[in-house]
Amino acid sequence: MSTLLIDLKGKELEQEEVELLSHPLVAGLILFTRNFEDREQIQELIRSVRQRVKKPLLITVDQEGGRVQRFRDGFTMLPSMQAFQETLSATEQVSFAKEAGWQMAAEMIALDIDLSFAPVLDLGHECRAIGDRSFSSDVKSAVNLAINFIDGMHQAGMASTGKHFPGHGHVLADSHLETPYDDRAKDEIFGYDLQPFQQLISQNKLDAIMPAHVIYGQCDSQPASGSEYWLKEILRKKLNFQGTIFSDDLGMKGAGVMGNFVERSKKALNAGCDLLLLCNEREGVIQVLDNLKLTENEPHFMARQARLKNLFKRSVIEWNDLVLDQRWKLNHRNLADIQSRWLDIQAAKND
């Protein structure tokens, strides 16, 4: 049973990485800025992975836009999600959100990447880890922009991943560095933070969801990423979500309360995650591969494997054809202009 997504150390594929990626438990990999030099190099790296690993691998990246954009030189400068609301009219916002989703997905698919983990559905901009990655603090605006962004992704042929369930926007701590605690009342979380996820699930817009490494103290004692309450009771049963559940990176400090890497993996799977990310922890990956025992007799084996298949890219796009496309050319200029205006607004605030 394939369940783990791992990372690569550098810009070239190492033999050890071929062996790790070939392990039956490994479902795919996630790419980072450290793997990127330029477009030709990253395409060659991906081609090498596809050729040397003799099984289908889900290749992923965080190419959200704004400050979370792993590939920059030679690619469209995608706006931060907050930039749409801050720089555009109401009509322009939804139009350009859709174009940003399409542009991002088309460029990644042209590299032979299956999935970019997007969009962020957290509300508000106060959390250090989220900030301008959030569309808005207003539920209606965030949902409207997210729908259009996802429609653009789907049009290009990429699945969507809503994150970070049930909402990371109202904790100041960064789960990359520590485990955040959100002690707000359950009614507030359900009536506000959860709404983008609930509404997008009801409209069948989300192919996957990534829960937060946040403990919501009035609801459960475990981080959402390792919580049966959040993933089985709320996400699967109450919201009737049928797509894939990714863990956020189990190498993050925010996941540390769940134990060592093997324990974190087991807890996330038992809580309801289908696929696990473990990054920047090569020894941790090896520990998990050596000690996590999953078989085809697992109760959710068939459902999990079916969900994995639904995440692979649904189109073939050639880079040389893409850059001749008038839609791409127009977006390439307009989206960069939106981000430039947003950066100017931020700079003026800081003066």
From Swiss-Prot:
Pfam families to which the protein is assigned, alphabetical: Glyco_hydro_3 (PF00933)
Gene3D superfamilies: Glycoside hydrolase, family 3, N-terminal domain
Superkingdom as given in the UniProt entry: Bacteria
GO cellular component, one term: cytoplasm
Catalytic-site annotation from UniProt: H176, D248
Cell cycle as UniProt keyword: yes
Main location group: cytoplasm
Localization of this protein: Cytoplasm
GO molecular function: beta-N-acetylhexosaminidase activity
Disulfide bond entries: none
Site annotation Important for catalytic activity: residues: D174
Swiss-Prot/TrEMBL keywords: Cell cycle, Cell division, Cell shape, Cell wall biogenesis/degradation, Cytoplasm, Glycosidase, Hydrolase, Peptidoglycan synthesis
E.C. no: 3.2.1.52
Pathway: Cell wall biogenesis; peptidoglycan recycling
Catalytic reactions of this protein: Hydrolysis of terminal non-reducing N-acetyl-D-hexosamine residues in N-acetyl-beta-D-hexosaminides
Its biological purpose: Plays a role in peptidoglycan recycling by cleaving the terminal beta-1,4-linked N-acetylglucosamine (GlcNAc) from peptide-linked peptidoglycan fragments, giving rise to free GlcNAc, anhydro-N-acetylmuramic acid and anhydro-N-acetylmuramic acid-linked peptides.
Protein's name in the database: Beta-hexosaminidase
Source organism of this protein record: Haemophilus influenzae (strain 86-028NP)
